[in-house]
């Protein structure tokens, strides 16, 4: 008989999650099509059948979540004239860390005349989780982009409360080789107390950042503000020939956040609208 206790396990190293997914999209024969697809480890990419409109890709982490020491990488590139909507099968879950941080690194590249929408579902952080998330975007002049990243600290409906965690979120967005948007957001280790601060979240446990870059982003400003309401804000800048629309949303829980985030994404994503997996 084998008896397992803490002494038996102390010298063992846990299996780590490693996943890499790479997707390149081209415009050929009147449609946006796959030109390259690479999948490794826990990262999988699936494409629902679409006859018209942008290519839709659904990212899947087959491990079901991440914890300390896990690594997940996504790389998406659009060639001239292509369009794509990238989303995830489900919310990404970041579980309690037994040591080290979970890392999610995303790189997006969009050539001239492309339209790229990066629309993952929420990332949920559990108590004592540690996450480092990085987003790097390279846009050529004339490319259009919509990016959404939503983060939830615990699921209130499940009675979950995040008291301690660490979260680092780094964004770098370049247009024509020039940085037009940069973020360095950090929370922790006392996340529960920090979220209560009026200058941070005012007690909210769910938040989202939305970034749109295109020549006509300004036409959505007033409608976006009406959707956002008082729990958030929306600003507009000129960046060369393009405009940059930045939205911040916060809410007491993920359900309240989605009630405004979903119509906002549907507005900003044009004819492509809201990804179907968001409503399942």
UniProtKB/Swiss-Prot annotation:
A molecular function GO annotation: nickel cation binding
Q: Where is the signal peptide?
A: none
Keyword Cytoplasm assigned = yes
Q: Where in the cell is it found?
A: Cytoplasm
InterPro entries given in the database record:
UreD (IPR002669)
Q: Which UniProt keywords apply?
A: Chaperone, Cytoplasm, Nickel insertion, Virulence
One matching Pfam family is UreD
Chaperone as a keyword of this entry, yes or no, is: yes
Q: Name one GO cellular component term.
A: cytoplasm
Looking up PANTHER family in the UniProt record yields: UREASE ACCESSORY PROTEIN D
The Swiss-Prot or TrEMBL record describes its family as follows: Belongs to the UreD family.
Q: How does it assemble?
A: UreD, UreF and UreG form a complex that acts as a GTP-hydrolysis-dependent molecular chaperone, activating the urease apoprotein by helping to assemble the nickel containing metallocenter of UreC. The UreE protein probably delivers the nickel.
Question: So what does this one do?
Answer: Required for maturation of urease via the functional incorporation of the urease nickel metallocenter.
Stated name of the protein: Urease accessory protein UreD 1
Organism the protein comes from: Brucella suis biovar 1 (strain 1330)
């Amino acid at each position: 008989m084998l008896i397992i206790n803490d002494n038996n396990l102390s010298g063992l190293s846990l299996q780590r999650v490693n996943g890499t997914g790479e997707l390149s999209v081209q415009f050929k024969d009147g449609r946006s099509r796959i030109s390259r697809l690479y999948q490794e480890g826990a990262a999988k990419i699936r494409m629902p059948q679409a006859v018209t409109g942008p290519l839709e890709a659904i990212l899947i982490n087959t491990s079901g979540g991440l914890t300390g020491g896990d690594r997940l990488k996504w790389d998406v590139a659009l060639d001239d004239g292509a369009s794509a909507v990238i989303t995830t099968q489900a919310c990404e879950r970041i579980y309690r860390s037994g040591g080290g941080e979970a890392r999610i690194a995303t790189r997006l590249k969009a050539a001239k005349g492309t339209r790229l929408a990066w629309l993952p579902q929420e990332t949920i952080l559990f108590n004592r989780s540690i996450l480092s998330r990085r987003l790097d975007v390279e846009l050529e002049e004339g490319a259009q982009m919509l990016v959404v990243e939503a983060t939830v600290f615990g699921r209130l409906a499940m009675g979950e409360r995040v008291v301690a965690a660490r979260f680092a979120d780094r964004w770098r967005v370049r247009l024509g080789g020039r940085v037009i948007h940069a973020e360095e957001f950090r929370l922790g280790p006392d996340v529960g107390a920090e979220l209560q601060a009026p200058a941070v979240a005012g007690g909210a446990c769910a938040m989202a950042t939305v970034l749109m870059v295109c020549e006509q982003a300004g036409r959505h400003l007033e409608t976006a503000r009406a959707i956002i309401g008082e729990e958030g804000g929306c600003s507009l800048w000129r960046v060369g020939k393009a405009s940059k629309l930045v939205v911040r949303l916060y809410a007491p829980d993920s359900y309240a956040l989605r009630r405004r985030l979903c119509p906002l994404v549907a507005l900003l994503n044009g004819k492509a609208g809201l990804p179907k997996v968001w409503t399942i």
